């Protein structure tokens, strides 16, 4: 565990480099066989009909893997993909070109206080996977939780699969502090976990 924590903290990323992103995606795609079932499990925890016309926000969408699975899970969904890496979003556009009429791409930084206004909303569902930990600072992550809560419609859901290197408990507590009515962690193999949080209906 100590070595894993250290590796997460020390890995540098250059998300604005087209070459770096292309090389990173090749390495990342090698984990698809392990990751895809986990993403499907995460999305199955959003209790909406499969044909519901949902407005979905993909936070830290990267090259579109989570959105791709969300389109399969919810056949009528409209998805807004947020990321601060132009090369990543360019890759997502290529990957998801067949669904372009149902997708929006928003280039913005989650550390910019105006990012919620830039993505729009409201949304029925917010999704994120192996993304928010890249903010490094827990307070920045917690700020995102508050923003995501406010971007959801009443009764909306946030499902997140991520690495919680310092443990899951502070994140569950902060999600509750952010206003989510129900917060659960239905799966975890530390440091990874899936979190489900819902906004109150009224």
Where are these regions (language model features)?
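Conserved class I S-adenosyl-L-methionine
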Residues: 1-49
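Class I SAM-dependent methyltransferase SAM/SAH-binding core
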Residues: 55-57, 63-113
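A short acidic, Gly/Pro-enriched loop at the edge of an enzyme's catalytic core
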Residues: 116-126
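A short SAM/SAH-binding and catalytic strip from SAM-dependent methyltransferases
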Residues: 124-139
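Core SAM-dependent methyltransferase catalytic element
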Residues: 187-202
């Amino acid at each position: 565990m100590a070595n894993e924590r250290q590796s997460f903290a020390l890995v540098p990323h250059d998300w604005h480099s087209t070459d770096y992103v292309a090389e990173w995606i090749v390495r990342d795609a090698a984990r698809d066989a392990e990751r895809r079932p986990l993403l499907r499990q995460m999305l199955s925890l959003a209790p909406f009909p499969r044909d519901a016309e949902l407005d979905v926000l993909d936070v830290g969408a990267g090259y579109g893997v989570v959105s791709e699975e969300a389109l399969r899970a919810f056949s009528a969904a409209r998805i807004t993909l947020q990321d601060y890496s132009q090369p990543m979003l360019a890759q997502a556009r290529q990957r998801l070109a067949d669904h372009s009429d149902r997708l929006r791409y928003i280039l913005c930084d989650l550390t910019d206080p105006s990012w919620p206004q830039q993505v729009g909303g409201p949304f029925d569902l917010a999704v994120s996977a192996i993304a928010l930990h890249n903010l490094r600072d827990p307070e920045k992550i917690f700020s995102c939780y508050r923003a995501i809560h406010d971007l959801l419609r009443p009764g909306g859901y946030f499902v997140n699969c991520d690495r919680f290197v310092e443990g899951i408990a502070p994140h569950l507590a902060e999600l509750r502090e952010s206003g989510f009515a129900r917060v659960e962690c239905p799966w975890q193999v530390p440091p990874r976990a899936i979190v489900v949080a819902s906004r109150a209906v009224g």
